[in-house]
Amino acid sequence: MYKVLVIIVTYNAHDWIHQCLNSVDMERYDAFVVDNASTDDTLSILHTEYPKAIVRAMDKNMGFGQANNIGLRYALDNGYDYVFLLNQDAWLLPDTIEKLIAAQNQHPEYWVLSPLQMNTAQGGMEKQFGVYCKKNKVQLNLDVPQPVDFVNAALWLISIECIRLVGGFNPIYPHYGEDVDFVQRIQYRRRNVGVVANVIAYHERVMGEESLKKMQYRTKLSLMGILLDINHPFVVAFLLLFFVGVRKIIKGIILGDKVLVNNMLRAIVAILSDVDSVLQYRKISRSIGAYL
């Protein structure tokens, strides 16, 4: 019997927390919840309705990556074999974790495995997850792990070996982008991230319209990810950043999209003004157990 820690990061999770935590078999797995200073009744629900859950209440919002790092450190310190990252807006089927562990045991070169991520409201595969599957030509009729260059961290089974060597999430990413960076660091160690298409779970996120501020933020993180990718020497990463940035600026000019052009220019200037930090984080990311 493997020792599994299910890590859930909550923030104002009233609408999701019951479905999420009710899907975790707490007789078999330990639930570790990090609450990012919720202002609703999330903590009250956790304390009164889920006494078996291990709860850590933060006095400020730590962001996705840093909150998960608290759970990852706990897993290392307490002898767990696996960690399962479970978004507050996601939920499991009874056999989700068990099947993923079986697949990982058969294919230990996969350090992170995701189930097929479905979405009730969308009536099938979660939209963004479907994009990842299509890009990586995931075959839905196979019952073995299939390699992908990325899958979001809403539902991740992570081996403890991965956590020991790769470490935790990079704190340069407060929210969004941290899972991309984590996957890049797995690839740096020549291990795989995969999807097991005959294993199912649900990610019930709702995609809304992005504000201008959020678009600018995500543009910066996207470009930052290119520069922080330790699979490339810094000079190569810098040239890739320049190429991607210039190409998108030209596209924006051709389309008359001033927002795209301004976002790209702002992001590039912000990143280049902090190159020293980027170089430092690239160095740390190569180390064993980084950020933990």
Explain the meaning of each model-derived region.
Residues M58-N78:
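Glycine-rich, basic loop-to-helix element that forms the pyrophosphate-binding segment
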Residues Y80-W91:
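Short beta-strand-to-loop acidic/aromatic patch adjacent to the donor-nucleotide binding site
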